Amino acid sequence: MLNQIIARKKEHIQTLQLPDDGHFERRSFKEALVNTHRSIGLIAEVKKASPSKGIIQPNFDPLQTAKAYEKSNADCLSVLTDEPFFQGKNEYLSLIKKHIARPILRKDFIIDSIQIEESRRIGADAILLIGEVLEPQQLHELYIEAKEKGLDILVEVHAAETLEQILNLFTPEIIGVNNRNLKTFNTTVEQTKEIAPLVPKDCLLVSESGIQTFDDLTFVKKHGASAVLVGESLMREPSQEKAVQTLFGE
């Protein structure tokens, strides 16, 4: 599935035309994860569908979801913009940016510098760079370019080997451990426990995917996560605000 997604993304980039610059203000994704509302930060994801689960929220309303997250004191938002596989849109991100005060992560498969400029123009405050998708050198180059454009970067890894290759080149400020294997789609929060000791102490560690319960949250926090990225378990509920409260045991 990952290979299909990347192949489709490469095709898309061939004909990608940059949108007009929305001249959005920049908000610090990193600062929001340092100064969190709770003892562990929350990046709440606006997500309609996924290739492994299909439609997650049939009554999808991106702006209402984002407002519910903001009301529930999510520290940052993550917005899916990949259309073919996740039914996301750039327009969702821009719309949310206009109405919500939280920093926004653009959740997509960034493989080319044109997508970084696109991210800036549509209002993203941060982008995702995936270690299992990019060669370490290419990831580093895209990281530097994003920084130069005023964006924060969440560098995501699944495997220890991937993280080690990246750390041999440079140390990202924010490292995300994807608890989901992108090849098999198997998910376990044990992955955060396994990878956390390899993450430099001055990095922010984000645990991503598979966090469904207060116990999951407690587990990844205990093993060093500064923040969690949660999408599906929140999006499946009729009220995202209540879902966040339940997740945090409130």
From Swiss-Prot:
Q: Which UniProt keywords apply?
A: Amino-acid biosynthesis, Aromatic amino acid biosynthesis, Decarboxylase, Lyase, Tryptophan biosynthesis
Please name the CDD domains in this protein's record: IGPS
Q: Looking at the Swiss-Prot or TrEMBL record, what is one Pfam family this protein matches?
A: IGPS
Q: Name one GO biological process term.
A: L-tryptophan biosynthetic process
Molecular function as annotated in GO: indole-3-glycerol-phosphate synthase activity; phosphoribosylanthranilate isomerase activity
**Can you state which reaction this protein catalyses?**
1-(2-carboxyphenylamino)-1-deoxy-D-ribulose 5-phosphate + H(+) = (1S,2R)-1-C-(indol-3-yl)glycerol 3-phosphate + CO2 + H2O
Could you say which EC number(s) this protein's record lists?
4.1.1.48
Functional pathway: Amino-acid biosynthesis; L-tryptophan biosynthesis; L-tryptophan from chorismate: step 4/5
Would the keyword Amino-acid biosynthesis turn up in this protein's UniProt record?
yes
Which InterPro entries does the protein's record reference?
A: Aldolase_TIM (IPR013785), Indole-3-glycerol_P_synth (IPR045186), Indole-3-glycerol_P_synth_dom (IPR013798), Indole-3-GlycerolPSynthase_CS (IPR001468), RibuloseP-bd_barrel (IPR011060)
Q: Which family does it belong to?
A: Belongs to the TrpC family.
Q: What is this protein called?
A: Indole-3-glycerol phosphate synthase
> What species is given as this protein's source?
Bacillus pumilus (strain SAFR-032)
